[in-house]
Design a protein with these regions (language model features):
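Residues at the starts of beta-strands that form the adenosine-phosphate
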Residues: 2, 26-28, 105-106, 141
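NAD(P)H-binding glycine-rich loop region in Rossmannoid oxidoreductase-like domains
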Residues: 3, 38, 45-94, 98-101
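Short, polar loop motifs at secondary-structure junctions
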Residues: 30-38
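N-terminal Rossmann NAD(P)H-binding glycine-rich loop of SDR-like oxidoreductase domains
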Residues: 2-23
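Oxidoreductase cofactor-interface core, primarily capturing Rossmann-like NAD(P)-dependent enzymes
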Residues: 24, 42, 117-214
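Conserved Rossmann-fold NAD(P)-dependent oxidoreductase catalytic core, especially the SDR/UDP-sugar
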Residues: 35, 82, 86-130, 136, ...
Length: 214
């Protein structure tokens, strides 16, 4: 399987990247990012761009893959809706428009855990709008991953300070099932791209289920 991955310089994207590089089901990973990811591997190719919105349909480097793992994103904390919408809505939808052929690809979008019935929350409105729009793009499969706390993958370089706080909560959260390992998240994406899944919204327990299929 050949995949395009975004967000390799962030925590989630890097973890998924490392799982893909270690996983024998993955033949090639094209990392599309603004900066080098800091890893080297025979499977890995990097495509650096300063502006995702400047990428154009028909770009031969973005064609012929089996899946997109769109892990790029930012926190909504301290962001105005217009700013957050560009990163979490406009860019992923533009990226979905320029890769192809869509009918042969699976698009996986990293959304986030939360109550998606509370549309008065800015980040929920934006993420839900993105999820719904991706489902109408004509991909072979489109899945919205909603992970919560994730335990790091061995060898990760891009770790924000807040992750250490989350990890301190790990023993407690583990009791209630609100966590995944980064390896599980990556394996779940690979499984969804290969085999599909009955629902488009992939919650924490669905990630565990999908990861167990590999």
């Amino acid at each position: 399987m050949k995949v395009i991955l975004t967000g390799a310089t962030g925590y989630v994207g890097e973890g998924v990247l490392l799982e893909c590089l270690d996983n024998p089901l993955i033949e090639k990973v094209l990392s599309v990012s603004r900066r080098p990811c800091g890893h080297m591997h025979p499977k890995l190719e990097e495509y650096l761009t300063e502006d995702f919105m400047a990428l154009r349909a028909g770009d031969p480097r973005l064609q012929g893959y089996d899946a997109v793992f769109f892990c790029a994103g930012i926190s909504s904390v301290g962001k105005k809706e217009e700013q957050y919408k560009v990163i979490s809505h406009d860019i992923p939808l533009h990226f979905a428009d320029i890769v192809g052929p869509r009918e042969r690809m699976t698009f996986i979008y990293v959304s986030g855990a939360g109550n998606y019935n509370h549309t008065d929350q800015m980040w929920v409105r934006v993420k839900k709008s993105t999820e719904d729009a991706l489902g109408r793009k004509g991909f072979r499969g489109a899945y919205n991953f909603r992970p919560a706390i994730m335990w790091r993958y061995k060898g990760q370089l891009h770790i924000q300070k807040i992750q250490y706080l989350f990890w301190a909560m790990y023993p407690l959260v583990k009791l209630f099932g609100g966590w995944n390992t980064m390896s599980e998240v990556g394996r779940a994406m690979i499984a969804a791209a290969r085999d599909g899944y009955p629902q488009r919204e992939i919650e924490v327990q669905d990630i565990t289920t999908l990861a167990g299929r590999l």
